Design a protein with these regions (language model features):
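Residues immediately C-terminal
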Residues: 126, 151, 168
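Structural recognition of the conserved hydrophobic beta-strand(s) that form the central parallel beta-sheet
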Residues: 120, 159-165
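Conserved small/polar residues in nucleotide/adenosyl-binding loops
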Residues: 203-205
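Canonical AAA+ ATPase core
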Residues: 163-173
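Detector for small/aliphatic-rich hydrophobic stretches
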Residues: 1-36, 48, 58, 65-69
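Conserved inter-motif catalytic segment of the P-loop NTP-binding fold
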Residues: 33, 41-44, 48-57, 61-148
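Substrate-engagement module of ASCE P-loop NTPases
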Residues: 141-161, 187
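A short helix-turn-beta junction within AAA+ P-loop NTPase domains corresponding to the substrate/partner-engaging
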Residues: 177-187
Length: 205
């Protein structure tokens, strides 16, 4: 432990997402060690937004001496499917690492192995821990997944963007405590009949 007066904040360097509005919603960019939940209805474009963000951050960190990779982990699509989407949106960066798994221990192992500048997990409802009972997307599983990701993010000082689905009534699928576990909750909304999308910050710690 250290005296609070000895702890400075000047060395906290936020990571730019490559989208000025996204950065603004996040208070200037992604804070290292933070966990941000991006919530929205299925099909609204959460995965595409975060894959574009992954490509942008990978491009910006390509020449860094350390933590010069971005890790995108999908529990919903295969590596080939993610690659096709990345090619379509211009996110084909050699230091953007893709993985497809629904196993929590594998997810944590990948983050610990590569120690990326940014880790993206898509989604909280598809990752499963073998240490607890319950189906994927259930309250017990989602809480365990979120808690483990938060612990890893804080320990390794690696920011994590976590996708979360929203139910028909507009609430985030899984336990309500999920919203209070993470550092930031962003709601991704849109009009089904237009290409207009809005990103709102609901909780920002």
């Amino acid at each position: 432990a250290r005296p609070i007066t000895d702890i400075g904040t000047e060395n906290i360097s936020r990571i730019a997402t490559g989208f000025s509005e996204f950065d603004r919603v996040l208070g200037g960019g992604i804070v290292p060690g933070s966990v941000t939940l991006i919530a929205g209805e299925p099909g609204i474009g959460k995965s595409t937004l975060l894959l574009e963000t992954a490509g942008n951050v990978a491009r910006l960190t390509a020449f860094a001496t350390e933590r010069n990779t971005v890790l995108y982990i999908s529990g919903e699509e295969s590596q080939a499917q993610v690659r096709m989407r990345a090619s379509r949106i211009g996110a084909m960066e050699p230091n953007l690492l893709l993985a497809s798994t629904t196993d929590l221990s594998t997810v944590l192992g990948l983050i610990e192995q590569f120690k990326p500048a940014l880790a993206i997990v898509d989604s909280a409802q598809t990752i499963v821990s073998q240490d607890v009972d319950g189906i994927s997307g259930g309250s017990t599983q989602v809480r365990e997944v979120a808690s483990a990701l938060i612990d890893t993010a804080k320990t390794l000082d690696i920011p994590v963007l976590l996708v979360g689905h929203v139910t028909k009534d507009g609430s985030i699928a899984g336990p309500r405590t999920l919203e209070h576990l993470v550092d930031v909750v962003c709601q991704f909304e849109g009009d089904a009949e237009t290409a207009l999308r809005m990103l709102l910050s609901l909780i920002h710690i």
